[in-house]
């Protein structure tokens, strides 16, 4: 079983009236993320006015590269939704320790 990847889980609360605009942005995020070599999986879930993004990367460096890659898209998303929580999960020790 593989357990040395790093996963990122941001949660957003959508501003009133912005649900369709937020959902329309999802393909842009997915397309941009598809170019990242360290990405393992990536996707969005919507529950009412809340968004959850489930994503994972080969390493912490992959997470940082992803954040650089989607920075402009994320800035736009934050005009339509508030970031309410972020979870980052990874191995206890790096594979080189």
Where are these regions (language model features)?
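Long, charge-enriched, surface-exposed interaction segments in small proteins/subunits
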Residues: 71-72
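Short S/T/G/P-rich N-terminal loop/turn motif that feeds into the first structured element of a domain
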Residues: 1-52, 58-68, 79-97
């Amino acid at each position: 079983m593989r357990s040395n990847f790093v996963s990122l889980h941001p949660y957003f609360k959508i501003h009133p009236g912005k649900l369709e605009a937020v959902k329309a942005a999802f393909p842009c995020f997915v397309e941009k993320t598809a170019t990242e070599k360290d990405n393992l999986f990536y996707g969005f879930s919507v529950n009412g006015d809340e968004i959850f993004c489930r994503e994972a990367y080969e390493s912490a460096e992959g997470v940082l590269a992803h954040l650089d890659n989607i920075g402009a898209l994320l800035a736009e998303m934050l005009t339509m939704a508030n970031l309410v929580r972020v979870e980052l999960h990874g191995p206890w020790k790096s594979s080189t320790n």
